């Protein structure tokens, strides 16, 4: 597969990536999606299981329908876990016009085969590869964890052709940012221990 030419180094891409929640209406073409998936499957994987599979959704009506299904399920799950009492507010999820996918034109689901011992970790490594590739290509991305309760219902899995032995691990929206992407500052690494080599080690 011909790969796009990018100007950023890998470290510049890591520092530039951030979650994007405002998108242009411009669609992401299928070739670009294929490149993102190619980046994803080159992630590290435990004992070479490669337990991932993907669903690509670009249908606006379906995306809105999934958003509407996800909002009440996510709020119910958050309340059950007591997240509102932990200082989180979920009022925006109660607004009919709020789209949890932020009107992005593309949603990519990274699904994991649950029989693989490290399927969740592997899928998240694939997710980071995908998001870094998107950033390097001038695209924005964002993990939409609030969609998970809806995406993993039996009804939705049948609709999206997700087998019973797979679950959605990382729902990622992708699109062209409607704003300038400004890198965010992060805290310095918390080093719990720094054990130098001994004289004989």
Features from the language model and the residues they span:
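Short proline/glycine-enriched turn/loop segments at secondary-structure junctions
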Residues: 157-163, 180-183
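A short N-terminal beta-strand-loop micro-motif at the entrance of redox/enzyme domains
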Residues: 20-35
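Small-aliphatic-rich amphipathic alpha-helix that forms the alpha element of a beta-alpha
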Residues: 40, 108, 113-158
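Glycine/small-residue-rich phosphate/adenosyl-binding loop
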Residues: 50-121
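C-terminal helix-cap and adjacent tail motif
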Residues: 2-6, 13-20, 94-95, 167-201
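Glycine-rich phosphate/pyrophosphate-binding beta-alpha loops
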Residues: 41-48
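A generic structural signal for short coil/turn motifs at secondary-structure boundaries
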Residues: 23, 116-120, 181
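Arginine/glycine-rich "motif VI" loop of SF2 helicases in the C-terminal RecA-like domain
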Residues: 135-136, 163-165
């Amino acid at each position: 597969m011909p790969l796009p030419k990018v100007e950023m180094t890998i470290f510049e891409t890591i520092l530039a990536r951030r979650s994007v929640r405002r998108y242009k209406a411009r669609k992401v073409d299928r070739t670009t999606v294929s490149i993102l998936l190619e980046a994803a499957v080159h992630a590290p994987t435990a004992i070479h299981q490669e337990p991932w599979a993907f669903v690509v959704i670009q249908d606006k009506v379906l995306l809105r329908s999934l958003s509407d299904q996800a909002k009440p399920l996510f709020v119910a799950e958050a309340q059950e876990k007591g997240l509102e009492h932990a200082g989180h507010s979920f009022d925006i999820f109660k607004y009919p016009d709020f789209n949890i996918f932020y009107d992005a034109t593309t949603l990519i689901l990274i699904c994991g085969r649950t029989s693989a011992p490290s399927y969740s970790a592997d899928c998240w490594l694939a997710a980071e590869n995908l998001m870094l590739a998107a950033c390097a290509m001038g695209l924005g991305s964002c993990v939409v964890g609030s969609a998970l309760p809806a995406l993993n219902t039996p009804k939705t899995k049948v609709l999206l052709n997700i087998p019973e032995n797979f679950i959605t691990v990382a729902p990622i929206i992708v699109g062209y940012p409607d704003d300038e992407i400004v890198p965010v500052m992060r805290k310095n690494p918390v080093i719990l221990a720094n054990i130098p080599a001994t004289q004989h080690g």
